[in-house]
Structure formats: C-alpha cells, structure tokens
Amino acid sequence: MRAVITGGTGGIGFAIASHFGKAGYQVVLADLNQQLLQQKTAELSSQGFTADYCVLDVTDQQAIDACARRFPADILVNNAGIQHVARLEDFPPEKWALLLNVMLTGPAMLTRAMLPSMRSNNFGRVINIGSIHAVIASPFKSAYVAAKHGLLGFSKVVALENADKNFTINTICPAYVKTPLVEQQIAAQAKEHNLTEQQVIEQIMLAPMPQKAFIDVSEIAAMAAFLCQDAARHMTAQTLILDGGWTAR
C-alpha cells in the first residue's frame, strides 16, 4: 500500500508519514525542499520504514502529473498549506491566488491525477487536511477560509463521482495545531497586537476552545490511519472536526 503525502516534511505531514510507516505502508513524502525531503526520508528509512520522496510544487500541473506517474497512490493525503493574514482590501491578488492554488486547486488536480490508478485497482483513500476554518470563519483570513471551505464541497463531489468503487474521500479539520506554520502565526499576531506570544496563545488562539489545548499532530495521524482501514470503508464525503469543543459554542 503506497501513501503519498503532500507537505510531507512538515509537522502534520511528517506525523502522518511516521504513523503510516509504522502501519507498514510505503510512504512517499511530497514537498518543495529536496534537501529536507532527503533528510526526512532518511529519518523514516532509519526506523525500518519503506520511504521515498517526490519534489512537488502542488501548483505545477506538470509536476503533479509526473508525481502521479512515478508514485501512483493507494492513499493520498492532501496536506500542503500556507497562510497569509490581511484585510480583504489589503490582500495582494497574487497572494490570494497562491493560497487558493496551494490549498484547493492543488489538492483537486493531484486527486484528479491519482484517480485513474485508484479506480483501476478498485481502492483509493483521499484524506484532505482541512482546518477548523473549513467550517467557521475568522477575520483577515479570507483566502484561507475560502480554500478550506471549498475543499469540503470538492470532496463531496468526488465522493459521489466515485461511489461505484472502493474509494473514499474525507477531510480532517483540526483547530490550532502546534506546527511551524502556527508558530509563525503566533509570532506575527504578537507583533501586530503588541502582545506576548503566551498572551496570543491564551487570549486569541485557545480562547474559543473549551478544552484550552492545541491539537497534537499524533491525533491527526491516528485519524488519518483510521480512514484508511476497512472499518471506515463507508465513511466518505465526511468532515471530521478536532476542535476541543470550539464548534459547540
């Protein structure tokens, strides 16, 4: 069983890769930085896992097609993500387009490229890493929220189109996870609001979460692994929310 994971060298992606490696899957890390890919792949291999890598820009259609030809996936994890925070009138159009390309068009085109082999083998699992912002909104994140909301609609359509096969597509939507991307947001918001980083964590990020704790990458990895199991074969087009109670408010 081969799993291709975009954003595979990052916090969430690498946690999923490690979990899948322990489960005996062949893991393919897909990301931009070749040196980091080689380092992380070697780290997986040193633990006895079967691992490889693919240098991939998810906004590059030729690169997407090449990755799918070289590593046709049984399991695809669309995890690559970026962020930009600004009021809409201050949002650079090219930055808006980039966020949509990375987090909506990229997953769509990579899923499109992987579908023929999945359908041919009568097995496919697509796992999108969404966000709490796929189901709620926050100011200054218009492009991110639009992309993540779009991912849910996209997944429902693909689920319907492939319901004749042993194929599922689902989206895991965590609240804030302590990853390098979130660390950057903490620093940026501390500067913008003249707060300490701890104040940003307590007063902004964890304030809406009744459990007052970051989601751990291991929780997301475990949920992704469950979605690949036969026990989840009828779970498709679903939005799985890990938010510490945020959406119960």
Protein language model regions, located:
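Active-site loop immediately N-terminal to the catalytic Tyr-X3-Lys motif
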Residues: E89, I136-A143, D164-K165, K212, ...
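Active-site helix of classical SDR
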Residues: T111, A147, S155
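Conserved glycine-rich cofactor-binding loop
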Residues: T9-G10
